[in-house]
C-alpha cells in the first residue's frame, strides 16, 4: 500500500462562498480509474473546543438549537478561531462568551485534528481550562444558549 495520492484532479470549480465556508467541486479520476466528482467544504475558521474543569472536576456544556441537524444539541464549549488569531486567545474568548468562565490555567489536549476529512478540511483543536472564575456570559446574538454544570 502506498501513501501517494491515488486521485487525479482534472479541474476544480468554486460552487459557493460565504464568510465561513467555501464549497469546491472537482472533476476527478478516482483510485479505481473512473471519472467522478468530489465536493470539498473549506472552513475559513479553525474549530476550537474547551473543556473547563473546576477544583471538584465539574465541567460545563452548552445547549443550543443547531440549524444543520434541525435538533437541539448539548455540546462541549466550542467555536471558530480565524486563521491568524492565536488559538489560546480564541479559546479564552469562546469560554467567556459561551459559558461565562475565565480560566487561569490552560492545557492544549488536541493540536490539530481533521474533523470530517471525507468532505471537509476543517481542523480542530481543544484545551482543558482550569483555575476558573465565573463572569457574565456574552454569547453572540445568534446564539441562544443554555449552560449546564455537571460532574466530569
Mark where each language-model region is.
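Short, well-ordered beta-strand micro-motif
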Residues: 25-27, 52, 128-130, 151
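Short secondary-structure junctions
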Residues: 6-14, 107-111
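Active-site segment of metal-dependent pyrophosphate-handling enzymes
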Residues: 42-45, 53-56, 66, 75, ...
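NUDIX/MutT-family hydrolases
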Residues: 44, 139-152
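Conserved Nudix-box catalytic region and its N-terminal flanking loop in Nudix hydrolases
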Residues: 2-6, 41, 49-93, 132-135
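Acidic, metal-coordinating catalytic segment for phosphate/diphosphate chemistry
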Residues: 11-49, 55
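Short beta-strand micro-motifs in enzyme catalytic cores
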Residues: 22-26, 72, 123-125, 146
Amino acid at each position: 500500500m502506498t501513501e501517494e495520492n491515488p486521485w487525479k484532479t482534472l479541474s476544480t470549480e468554486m460552487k459557493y462562498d460565504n464568510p465561513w465556508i467555501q464549497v469546491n467541486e472537482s472533476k476527478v479520476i478516482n483510485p479505481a480509474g473512473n471519472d467522478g466528482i468530489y465536493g470539498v467544504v473549506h472552513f475559513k475558521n479553525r474549530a476550537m473546543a474547551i473543556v473547563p474543569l473546576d477544583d471538584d472536576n465539574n465541567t460545563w456544556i452548552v445547549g443550543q438549537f443547531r440549524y444543520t441537524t434541525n435538533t437541539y444539541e448539548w455540546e462541549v464549549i466550542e467555536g471558530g478561531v480565524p486563521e491568524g488569531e492565536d488559538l489560546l486567545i480564541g479559546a479564552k474568548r469562546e469560554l467567556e462568551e459561551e459559558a461565562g468562565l475565565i480560566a487561569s490555567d490552560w492545557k492544549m489536549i488536541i493540536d490539530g485534528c481533521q474533523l470530517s476529512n471525507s468532505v471537509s478540511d476543517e481542523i480542530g483543536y481543544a484545551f482543558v481550562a482550569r483555575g476558573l472564575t465565573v463572569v457574565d456570559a456574552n454569547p453572540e446574538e445568534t446564539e441562544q444558549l443554555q449552560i449546564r454544570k455537571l460532574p466530569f
